[in-house]
Amino acid sequence: MTYLQESSRPAVTVPKLQAMRDAGEKIAMLTCYDASFAALLDRSGVDVLLIGDSLGNVLQGHTTTLPVSLDDIAYHTACVARAQPRALIIADLPFGTYGTPAEAFASAVKLMRAGAQMIKLEGGEWLAETIRFLVERAVPVCAHVGLTPQSVHAFGGFKVQGKTEAGAAQLLRDARAVEDAGAQLVVLEAVPTLVASEVTHMLKIPTIGIGAGTDCSGQVLVLHDMLGIFPGKRPRFVKDFMQGQPTIQAAVEAYVRAVKDSSFPGPEHSF
């Protein structure tokens, strides 16, 4: 069996994401952890495949992402890359792997050698030096602000961020800082719609929302969540796209269409 497929779709690159944002075309991102799903998501029109540390929850059964190791992410990144998707491949830097700029670079090198084309890391102003260090060394960076799951214990749980005036101001500072440091993409998670909209209009780089309203440049969901196969309480920002669909591919195509035409997320998925 081979996962390689002929595709006339142009490869999605980091500059392509910027061009999509500038043209007003929404970016559809999903998490992905293996070659089979990488091929399926790619032919369904997904623009970005994220090897997220969410694999700690949906694959390994942990209650947080903290136990996920760099080797775990590298393994699943290599699995996804073997499908040779046209979609851009982004890999998460796990908890405890980017405490210093030098450590972050060493971790990023391992993931890029495994097949990642961009790395994602969680944090705002305090990460500016690290982001700048990576970008100067040819590592494309996606920042992640708002609710950062690796900070679950510091936050006291999975809570919406930026709800207060002070919190919103900090989120704006974080977003500006990561852009100024050279990040080419930023994920906004569990952020009030109005705040996410302000961030999106303030920045020149694309924003990817998850529980951040419809004004972001694109959307991301955890694959298992959007297919309705992850047990337990479903976050407000999740929609089960498998409902009413005959196949997984049809569900993914429905997700892509909903992101592209801005029918997802709706008010019921936002804060």
From Swiss-Prot:
Its EC number is 2.1.2.11. Belongs to the PanB family. Homodecamer; pentamer of dimers. The gene is panB1. Pathway: Cofactor biosynthesis; (R)-pantothenate biosynthesis; (R)-pantoate from 3-methyl-2-oxobutanoate: step 1/2. The keyword RNA-binding does not apply. 3-methyl-2-oxobutanoate binds at residues 53-54, 92, 120. Its cofactor is Mg(2+). This is 3-methyl-2-oxobutanoate hydroxymethyltransferase 1. It comes from Burkholderia ambifaria (strain ATCC BAA-244 / DSM 16087 / CCUG 44356 / LMG 19182 / AMMD). It comes from the Bacteria.
